[in-house]
Design a protein with these regions (language model features):
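Hinge/lid segment of periplasmic solute-binding proteins
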Residues: 36-55, 120-175, 324-327, 336
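Short, well-ordered beta-strand elements
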Residues: 58-69, 88-93, 116, 165
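Extracytoplasmic "Venus flytrap"/periplasmic binding protein-like
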Residues: 80-149, 184-187, 288-299, 315-318
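Extracytoplasmic/periplasmic substrate-recognition and gating elements
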Residues: 83, 89-91, 186, 314-402
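A structural signal for short loop-to-beta-strand junctions that line the ligand-binding cleft
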Residues: 105-107, 115, 142-182, 219, ...
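Extracytoplasmic/periplasmic solute-binding protein
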Residues: 117, 157-169, 174, 199-257, ...
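Glycine-centered hinge/linker elements that transmit conformational signals in sensory
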Residues: 204, 245-282, 323, 327-333
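Conserved C-terminal helix/tail region of periplasmic/extracytoplasmic solute-binding proteins
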Residues: 408-522
Length: 522
């Protein structure tokens, strides 16, 4: 599913450099607040105690929230927000991710810009100047200091500036899954919970048995996400983004190591066949089969939502799997011995530049994303399995994210809900995993200015992945040129989006730095 979502998002147009205009149709009155006061009053609804902000307008207003989140969940959240703030009407508008960007630009061109939006492709949002700077609210909000550490430490959503344009809405931590039944069948010892990258590679090799006694080959790894994307973050704690990005510069020599290692595993026969290939039909007897249902794969680089949405469902009980989570390993033993940076999927949101009530819009965005009150409400709806999506599936099984707050009450409630059908042993493994995944680094196209332009116009256009995977080229052969290209695209984007002709938030020193990067990397 995620492959289709990402493919659709990345294929969408990134044209029409429109400055967001229009409004919510609420008149010309504006809330004068530029910060969050932090003053609240306790309100109880359905046994949940909320901290209702007291610094919002008391006018009757309407806010439009345009999103591609799970629709029924958002409607539930919107209803609760309106119950808390009865003077605010929330118009929650869902759009399928495949048409989201085009529909949003149409709304902008028709003077119907929503007040709050979601987005994944940061180049799309930034090049169209859709997002306002919410740093005044963010920096004064007590809750933002209690999020996963990298959100503030690495400026996630700031895009290398002192401003803040994006906030994390949906957080899907990076995770490695191991089928313990496969390890038992092969008499392979489970790796340490503080495993290293080398430990993982060894496990993949140890669990690949092509001539197995039962006549069906065992593979060490079934992949959904490529290992090179993981390696680019796992290599060092100084890395803040894919392709060895340190916050300013790229270094694709880091990526090249992981890319080559993954290619060597594929060429060496350690990676399970993928769906809709002749290799899959030969192995599982079904062109449409998925290696995650084989019972013959040790490790999976699947998405976070695959466990609840697939493996935890009744339909998969027949496959005799024992799937447990592991944190994405770090390369060095020192990093692996403690909590460390790991790749994550994060969808972002922001307040648009035309919003007439930015303080209230920020509170709505917070409720829909990282806020403690919003997460208390999410846990309530996820616990109620009678509330379903259009297909009749309980909402906890429909691409449910994880909290990005570190609030203990939220996490206790989330783990109890997430692990409600597990025994104590498996619950303990999930508790340990969740405690170790709160240094997320988002995929580059969601978090680094110019990243997708680089991928679209250079990296993907010459097909580097395919060339290396087929053994016709070495990743290291591209590292130097790709580094120059990535730095040029990034510096160009920083000047375009944030320089004098854009948001105008760069200092003279920063402008000089990026101008020099453009010159040096022509």
């Amino acid at each position: 599913m995620k492959k289709r979502i990402v493919a659709c998002m990345l294929a969408l147009t990134m044209v029409l450099g429109l400055t967001a205009c229009g409004g919510s149709g609420n008149g010309s009155s504006k809330s004068g607040a530029t910060t969050v006061s932090g003053e609240t009053e306790a309100v109880e609804i359905n046994g949940i105690t909320y901290n209702k902000a007291t610094d919002l307008t008391d006018e009757e207003i309407t806010l439009t929230y345009f999103h591609f989140d799970q629709d029924e969940t958002v409607k539930y959240l919107a209803d609760r927000f309106m119950e808390l703030y009865p003077n605010i009407t929330v118009n929650a508008v869902y759009e399928n991710v495949a048409t989201y960007n085009d529909t949003l630009l149409t709304l902008v061109s028709n003077n119907e810009t929503p007040d709050v939006i979601m987005y994944s492709d940061c180049d799309f949002a930034l090049s169209n100047f859709l997002l306002s700077d919410v740093s005044g609210f963010w920096n004064s909000d007590p809750e933002t200091a209690k999020l996963a550490s990298t959100i503030n430490d690495c400026g996630v959503g700031c895009y290398g500036t002192s401003a803040r344009f994006g906030v994390p809405v949906k957080f899907f931590p990076g995770v490695m899954y191991i089928d313990m039944n496969v390890l038992e069948a092969l008499n392979v010892e489970a790796p340490s919970r503080n495993w290293t990258w080398a430990d993982m590679i060894q496990l993949i090799k140890d669990c690949t048995v092509l001539d197995s006694p039962d006549g069906m080959a065992y593979y060490g790894c079934g992949y959904y996400n490529r290992l090179d994307s993981y390696y680019g973050i796992a290599a060092a704690q100084t890395i803040q983004g894919e392709f060895g990005f340190d916050g300013t510069d790229f270094d694709l020599s880091v990526w090249a190591v992981g890319e080559q290692e993954f290619s060597d595993l594929k060429l060496g026969g350690y990676i399970a066949p993928t769906t809709e290939t002749q290799e899959m039909e030969d192995w599982m007897g079904d062109w449409e089969a998925w290696c995650g249902a084989s019972g013959h794969v040790a490790l999976f680089t699947e998405a976070f939502w695959t466990y609840q949405g697939t493996w935890a469902t009744e339909a998969f009980e027949q496959y005799d799997l024992d799937i447990v989570p592991y944190v994405v390993p770090a390369v060095s033993e020192a990093d692996a011995s403690a909590d460390h940076h790991s790749i994550a999927t994060i969808d972002f949101g922001g307040v648009t530049t035309s919003c007439q009530y930015p303080r209230e819009a920020y509170e709505l965005l917070k409720f829909m994303s990282f806020g403690v009150d919003g997460w208390k409400t999410r846990i309530e709806v996820y616990n109620d399995t009678s509330i379903t999506n259009a297909s009749g599936l309980a909402l906890k099984y429909d691409v449910m994210p994880a909290p990005i707050t570190t609030n203990e009450e939220v996490w206790n409630g989330y783990i109890d809900m997430y692990c409600s059908d597990m025994d104590e042993e498996h619950k303990a493994l999930w508790e340990e995993y969740f405690a170790s995944c709160l240094q997320p680094i988002p995929y580059g196209w969601t978090s680094i200015a110019g990243y997708w332009n680089f991928c679209d116009e250079y990296f993907n256009s010459i097909g580097i992945h395919d060339l290396v995977d087929k053994g016709t080229a070495k990743a290291a052969d591209y590292a130097e040129e790709a580094t120059r290209k990535a730095n040029w695209y990034h510096a160009t984007a920083m000047l375009k989006y944030f320089g004098a002709e854009g948001y105008n938030v760069l200092t003279e020193e920063e402008i000089a730095l990026y101008e020099q990067m453009v010159t040096d990397n022509q």
